[in-house]
Amino acid sequence: MSAAQLSTFSVNGHLFGVEVAVVQEVIRYQPMTRVPLAPAALAGLINLRGQVITAVDLRRRLGFPERAAGELAMDVIVRTSDGLVSLLVDRIGDVVEVAQETFEEPPETLAGIARELIRGAYKLDHALLLLLDVQGAVDLPPLDNGSGTVVATPM
């Protein structure tokens, strides 16, 4: 029986997981510099020990409501093909081991962009663990400056 290790976190009450191998570290909320005209999901840029990292708000990216005022996100720093990126999440979970045999297709109840960014699901004893497509989550759509000209997304 083959197993995978996933680092888990929650966003809007949903449990998500990403492969442990892509997670560099998990840190408390970091002050951010906003990027003018950036897509809503691009929360800003953070300074991680002198390295500038793009922060993607998973609530916005997945189409969930905004966080309550005063509620700070946590940063899950992941390695992608574009370098390090911070995923802003509500809460950090544990590292769990899941049997590959329990992997299922994404639930039919997922709608919109969330359905496109979920690779599948694992049924745990206490919850449904949604496997996030990390690269898809950080690949933001290009900007349209209103004149019909597409502007490159800052990354």
Model features per residue range: what roles?
Residues 1-155:
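An acidic, low-aromatic, low-complexity terminal/linker signal
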